[in-house]
Amino acid sequence: MEKQKILFVSQEIYPYLPETEMSVIGRYLPQGIQEKKREIRAFMPRYGSINERRNQLHEVIRLSGMNIIIDDSDHSLLIKVASIQSGRMQVYFIDNEDFFHRKGILTDKDGKYYPDNDERAIFFARGVLETVKKLRWSPELVHCHGWITSLVPLYLKHAFKEDPLFAKSKVVYSV
């Protein structure tokens, strides 16, 4: 019998970001699912505060190179990957210099939300789904964790509804 395929899309995953309730869930929930003999792919944004060298992120050339258009502007999509050795789990990172190379995750140093967080969420959601398409991987369940992932279900229901890879995908959303 084939393993159930689960796409886990998270706003934060520990140890790549500081330990918070959200990042800890983002870290251990996918591992627990994988330990139950499910096939899981985890995605998160590649925020500027993530140290690529220390966390051993590297670009996946065959998945990178797409452009995503938002408001008539082209934005290059880079896909990076790293492993959490203790959990035997890979994490894919959606990267773009314009949207994610900032020290703050969602807010600036004064605690104000970035004015383009909506575009960042659009880019992230579309980047995840386009990458999954490029992988030719058909998830049975898509679990979205955190508000920056909230557009993924909308895209699945509307923009990707005719795509056979997502035809049978069910969605779970948690915050």
Task: Annotate each language-model stretch with its function.
Residues M1-V175:
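Catalytic cores of nucleotide-sugar-dependent glycosyltransferases that transfer UDP/GDP/TDP-activated
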